[in-house]
A protein has these predicted regions:
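Transmembrane beta-barrel strands of outer-membrane/channel proteins
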Residues: 29-37, 71-75, 117-121, 178-182, ...
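Outer-membrane beta-barrel "beta-signal"
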Residues: 361-373
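Short loop/turn motifs that connect adjacent beta-strands in outer-membrane beta-barrel proteins
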Residues: 21-27, 60-70, 114, 173, ...
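Outer membrane beta-barrel
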Residues: 60-183, 278-286, 290-294, 298-315
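Membrane-embedded beta-strand positions in outer-membrane beta-barrel channels/transporters
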Residues: 54-56, 105-107, 163-165, 208-210, ...
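Detector for outer-membrane/organellar transmembrane beta-barrel domains
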Residues: 214-314, 331
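Sequence/structural signature of outer-membrane beta-barrel proteins
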Residues: 34-42, 76-80, 126, 149, ...
Length: 373
C-alpha cells in the first residue's frame, strides 16, 4: 500500500471525536463505511463477483454557531464491474469508483437560520439534483440523473470541484439554491484525489439554480432546476466545437401516506439538455419508498425504474455507446441491525437496447452494508 494511502487510512481511524476548546472552537469527526458484495450475469468476459466499498471521514471545526471549516477524506476499493465488464450506461452501483484515496469535499461554511453559504471544493450532488426518497437506492441514476453526469464533466463522487454555493429560505414554502462550479472537476494524480482550484477559460464554469417548493400541506417537495455549462463541447451533428450546454430538470418527492411511523413515498426525476452537444436526449426516473412496513427496527423497501434515452440520431453517439436507450429496475430492502449498522440486499434488472450484437440483459444481485463509527 502506498505511503500516502497508509497515512490517510490512519487518519480515518480517528472517528466519532468531539473536542471543545477553551476558545469556543468545537471539533467533530465522523466516519462511515459503505461496502457491498455484488454479482452479475453479464455475458461479457470478466470476474462475476466483486467486493467494493467507500470509506469517508468528515471533520468539522466550528468556530462559532455560524462559521465552520469542513474536510472530507475518502478511500475507495474494489473493481469497476459496471465500466469494465457489464458495460451498462448508467453505472449500476453508486459506490463504484475503483481504488482511489484522497480529498473529497473541503469548504468553509457560513450558516444562519434560513441561509447558508459554502466556498471551497464541493460535490454537486450534495445540495443539487437530490431526491430524498431516491437516496435509498443503490443505482447511480436515482442519486443523480445521467444527463448531468454523462453529458458534462459534473463534479460528483468521486471527484469534486471548486465552487461557491448558497441557499436561502424565501418563506416557509419556497427555498432557492444557487451554485457556481469549476467547469472541470479536480483531476486524478494516479489514484490520488487532488485539490485543484485553477479555473480554465476553455473548461468554463457550471452555473446552477434550483428553486424548491413545498406544496400540498408540505407533502410534496418540488424542485425545478436549470444549469448552464459555459465550456467547449463537440457538436454531435457537425463535429465542430461549440460553446455551452444547458439543461432543465425536475425532482419531486411526495408523501403518499403516513400512519404512525409508517410512510409511503414517491419520487420522480426528469432531465433534458441541449441535444446537439449531449449524448443523452432525456432521462426520467420514478420510484416507491416504504418506511417501517416490516415490524421491529427501522426499515425501508424500495422499488424504482429509470430510463435514459440517447441521442442515437447522431452516428457518433451510436458508435460510442451501441445503444438507443437503457432502462433499469431496482428492488431493495434496507434493515437497521444496530444503531451503527444497516444491511441492504438489492436486485437490479438492466434493459440495454443495443443496436448491434445484442446480449442478454444483465441482472445484478448484491448485499450492501452501512457502517457508522
Amino acid at each position: 500500500m502506498p505511503k500516502k494511502q497508509l497515512l490517510l487510512l490512519s487518519f480515518l481511524l480517528f472517528t466519532s471525536i468531539e473536542v471543545r476548546s477553551q476558545t469556543g472552537f468545537k471539533f467533530s469527526n465522523e466516519t462511515a463505511y459503505l461496502s457491498e458484495l455484488v454479482t452479475h450475469n453479464s455475458e461479457n468476459p470478466g470476474q462475476k463477483t466483486h467486493f467494493i466499498g467507500w470509506l469517508l471521514n468528515t471533520s468539522t471545526l466550528k468556530m462559532n454557531e455560524k462559521h465552520s471549516l469542513n474536510l472530507g477524506l475518502m478511500l475507495t476499493h474494489g473493481g469497476e464491474p459496471s465500466a469494465d465488464i457489464v458495460g451498462d450506461l448508467q453505472t449500476f452501483s453508486n459506490l463504484e469508483a475503483g481504488s482511489l484515496y484522497g480529498f473529497y469535499e473541503m469548504y468553509y461554511q457560513y450558516q444562519t437560520d434560513g441561509f447558508w453559504l459554502k466556498v471551497g471544493q464541493q460535490d454537486l450532488n450534495t445540495d443539487f439534483l437530490v431526491s430524498e426518497n431516491g437516496l435509498l437506492f443503490t443505482h447511480s441514476s436515482f442519486g443523480i440523473d445521467p444527463v448531468a453526469t454523462i453529458g458534462m464533466p459534473a463534479p460528483t463522487y468521486p471527484p469534486t470541484a471548486a465552487a461557491i454555493t448558497a441557499g436561502i429560505n424565501l418563506n416557509e414554502q419556497v427555498r432557492l439554491q444557487l451554485g457556481i462550479f469549476d467547469g472541470q472537476f479536480a483531476s486524478l494524480n494516479d489514484n490520488f484525489l487532488t485539490v485543484n482550484w485553477d479555473i480554465s477559460k476553455d473548461e468554463g464554469l457550471l452555473y446552477i439554480i434550483e428553486p424548491e417548493f413545498k406544496l400540498l400541506n408540505n407533502r410534496l417537495t418540488q424542485k425545478i432546476g436549470f444549469y448552464q455549462h459555459s465550456g467547449l463541447f463537440v457538436d454531435r451533428e457537425t463535429s465542430n466545437v461549440s460553446k455551452g450546454q444547458s439543461a432543465f430538470y425536475l425532482v419531486s418527492d411526495y408523501q403518499l401516506l403516513e400512519k404512525g411511523e409508517k410512510t409511503a413515498n414517491l419520487f420522480f426525476q426528469f432531465n433534458t439538455s441541449t441535444k446537439a452537444v449531449s449524448d443523452l436526449n432525456y432521462y426520467y426516473g420514478l420510484g416507491l419508498r416504504l418506511v417501517n412496513y416490516v415490524g421491529g427496527k427501522p426499515n425501508e423497501i424500495g422499488l424504482a425504474l429509470g430510463h435514459a434515452k440517447l441521442n442515437d440520431d447522431f452516428i457518433s453517439v451510436r458508435n460510442e455507446y451501441n445503444l438507443t436507450s437503457e432502462t433499469v429496475v431496482e428492488l431493495n430492502y434496507k434493515q437497521e441491525v444496530k444503531d451503527w449498522l444497516s444491511i441492504q440486499p438489492y436486485f437490479q434488472w438492466i434493459g440495454m437496447n443495443e443496436i448491434n450484437n445484442p446480449q442478454r440483459n444483465p441482472i445484478i444481485l448484491a448485499l450492501r452494508a452501512y457502517i457508522e463509527f
